[in-house]
A protein has these predicted regions:
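Asp-based, Mg2+/Mn2+-dependent phosphohydrolase catalytic module
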Residues: 2-10, 15-19, 26-36, 45-69, ...
Length: 271
């Protein structure tokens, strides 16, 4: 197939704790030399597009903010469309306000230690961190049980650091959905909107793109659902046991390609 562009997950594919994975910079240079468009789709909510691009560039990968699509950007688009002028309570680890222009954040976890805030119109859940404490999550659960819409920037249950795996928003969200009997809306991966938005930004059709990720479900298979060609890398959160269990199911969708790391991508693409 013609290569219209390549969509990369970031954490665990290009970097781990913002330290470059061996061969990542060389792969991006090869794609640039071959004039193959690139986009970067991440559920990272601790940093803005500008900060992410700066960190990748400092790690030897020339990336511009316009090439980065974050879960916060997608969430802001969703809220503006679905809940215009909503008063939003935000729980997130990191300041991402620059990626959410026009969103009315009436309260956030800066209110910890004070009384319970007024009931918001919408609750926004970003990435997990110290802000996900007992009191704050109790507020969110109370509002969720009352029927206040909860919009999660993603459903990721973990991410990879140089010190090992860390739990993420999805761990908490699953529990609150179970006990409240209500479902949150998740906007980031594996929802299709981010994959489609990334293709649209490059001006190509999804079936002309490759998606490269370390998460079998949230990255690779989710991209394949919208027509992209999936490439699973054996770095980051990849676990061989997970792939083996998946491969044993004859009815399950399988990744189109599996490679050791992003360093092997040029060879796979015939570059």
């Amino acid at each position: 197939m013609a290569i219209g562009g390549v969509l990369f997950d970031i954490d665990g594919v290009l970097v781990t704790s913002w330290k470059p994975i061996e061969g990542a910079a060389a792969t991006l240079r090869t794609l640039s030399e071959q004039q193959i468009a690139r986009s970067y789709l991440t559920n990272t909510t601790t940093r803005t597009r500008v900060q992410i691009a700066d960190l990748l560039t400092a790690a030897g990968m020339a990336v511009s903010p316009d090439e980065v699509v974050t879960a916060a950007v997608l969430t802001a688009d969703f809220v503006r469309d679905r809940y215009p002028d909503a008063r939003c309570f935000l729980v997130n680890s990191g300041d991402i306000s620059d990626d959410m222009p026009g969103i009315d954040i009436v309260a956030s976890v800066d209110t910890r230690g004070g009384p319970m805030p007024d009931t918001p119109d919408v609750v926004l859940l970003g990435g997990a961190g110290p802000e996900y404490d007992h009191v704050t999550l109790s507020w969110v659960y109370d509002w969720m049980a009352q029927g206040v819409p909860v919009v999660a920037m993603h459903r990721s249950t973990s991410w990879t650091t140089t010190e090992g795996l860390r739990i993420d928003t999805g761990m908490y969200l699953l529990g609150m959905e179970e006990v409240s009997g209500r479902k949150a809306t998740a906007v980031g991966k594996p929802a299709p909107e981010g994959f489609l938005a990334s293709a649209a930004r490059l001006g190509v059709e999804p079936d002309e793109m490759y998606i490269v990720g370390d998460d079998l479900n949230n990255d690779v298979l989710a991209g394949q659902v919208v027509g992209m060609t999936g490439v699973l890398v054996r770095t980051g959160k990849f676990r061989q046991a997970t792939l083996d269990r998946w491969a044993a199911d004859e009815f399950a969708m399988q990744p189109n390609h599996v490679i050791d790391s992003v360093a092997d991508l040029p060879e796979l693409l015939g570059l």
